């Protein structure tokens, strides 16, 4: 039993030794805070808490802006350029949005959706910074207190700067 306990403790410490945290800011279609947790060299969880314009805003009567939590799971592949990776994955987005109704009435609505994510990340060699550029197409729905539901396709382009902890 002691051997199993020692093996589990060693495994937990080795997981933390591989883990890398990044924290910073994201700007573009979303503006806010960005956090990335690396499970290993290729698999990461990225979570962004941001305010932004919904890209469908000028084309539909769905939403003008949103406040979103957007967690994504990403898989990274190394490219021939040193410290440059391409990534792809998917995630959820949920939060609040300013729901524009027919006429001129404005209501705050809940929002939920799914999205894909793809982009490039460059890790600076001389300082512990990561620069990332990503594209996020997605599908979502907003719902207000009167059970009115709106469906929309949305996309965001964003640039992130994160400090490696």
Predicted regions, residues:
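Sec-dependent N-terminal signal peptides
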Residues: 4-13
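Sec/Tat signal peptide C-region and signal peptidase I cleavage site
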Residues: 13-19
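Solvent-exposed loop/turn segments connecting transmembrane beta-strands
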Residues: 21-34, 51-65, 81, 143-152
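Gram-negative (and chloroplast) outer-membrane scaffold detector with strong preference
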Residues: 37-133
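Flexible, surface-exposed loop regions and adjacent strand-edge segments
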Residues: 104-107, 148-154
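C-terminal binding/interaction regions
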Residues: 134-136, 160
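Short helix/strand-capping connector loops at secondary-structure junctions
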Residues: 136-144
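Outer-membrane beta-barrel "beta-signal"
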Residues: 153-165
């Amino acid at each position: 039993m002691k051997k199993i306990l020692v093996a589990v403790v060693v495994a937990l410490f080795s997981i933390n030794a591989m883990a890398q945290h990044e924290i910073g800011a994201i700007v573009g279609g979303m503006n806010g805070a960005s956090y990335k947790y690396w499970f290993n060299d290729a698999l990461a969880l990225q979570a962004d808490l941001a305010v932004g314009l919904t890209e469908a805003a000028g084309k539909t009567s769905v939403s003008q802006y949103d406040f979103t939590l957007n967690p994504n799971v990403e898989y990274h592949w190394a490219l021939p350029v040193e410290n440059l990776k391409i990534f792809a994955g998917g995630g959820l987005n949920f939060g609040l949005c300013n729901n524009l109704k027919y006429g001129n009435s404005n209501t705050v609505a809940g929002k939920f959706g799914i999205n894909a994510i793809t982009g490039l990340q460059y890790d600076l060699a001389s300082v512990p910074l990561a620069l990332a550029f990503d594209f996020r197409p997605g599908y979502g729905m907003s719902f207000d207190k009167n059970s009115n539901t709106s469906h929309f396709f949305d996309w965001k382009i964003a640039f992130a700067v994160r400090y490696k902890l």
